């Protein structure tokens, strides 16, 4: 399918895979799962590489999950330079989780992104004091 939220629109397959995808490509369910595992690992590692020691030590499993989801959705470069990561690297975990909710635009305000960010925020703050 053509992801029309992206600018410019980008051919996409499975659960948001875009690298090397051409319109008309077909994948099996097993191939999609394998692609998702590989891409999720790549995005998770990209997020982790943007952390300072303070940011890394501030992680809970829930913060890690929320930021990995955000990174998969908006990209490693966008997350790495974000206020959310800057706050996390400063040890401001709650502020970092709040900043996740700011990513609701994809060229224009995208209604589908608001509930996603709310879910990521709820995951991110789970267990925080």
Identify the residue ranges that each predicted region occupies:
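Extracytoplasmic
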Residues: 8-10, 62
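Long, amphipathic alpha-helical surface segments
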Residues: 5-8, 21, 26-38, 44, ...
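A short, structured beta-strand/loop element
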Residues: 10-13, 17-20
């Amino acid at each position: 399918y053509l992801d029309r939220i992206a600018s410019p629109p980008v051919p996409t397959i499975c659960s948001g895979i875009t690298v090397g995808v051409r319109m008309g490509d077909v994948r099996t369910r097993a191939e999609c799962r394998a692609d998702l595992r590989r891409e999720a690992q790549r995005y998770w590692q990209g997020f982790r590489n943007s952390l300072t020691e303070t940011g890394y030590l501030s992680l809970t499993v829930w913060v890690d999950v929320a930021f990995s989801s955000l990174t998969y959705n908006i990209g490693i470069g966008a997350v790495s330079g974000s206020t959310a990561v800057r706050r996390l690297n400063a040890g401001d975990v709650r502020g970092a989780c709040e900043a996740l909710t700011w990513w609701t635009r994809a060229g224009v305000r995208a209604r589908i992104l608001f509930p996603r960010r709310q879910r990521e925020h709820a995951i991110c703050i789970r267990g925080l004091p």
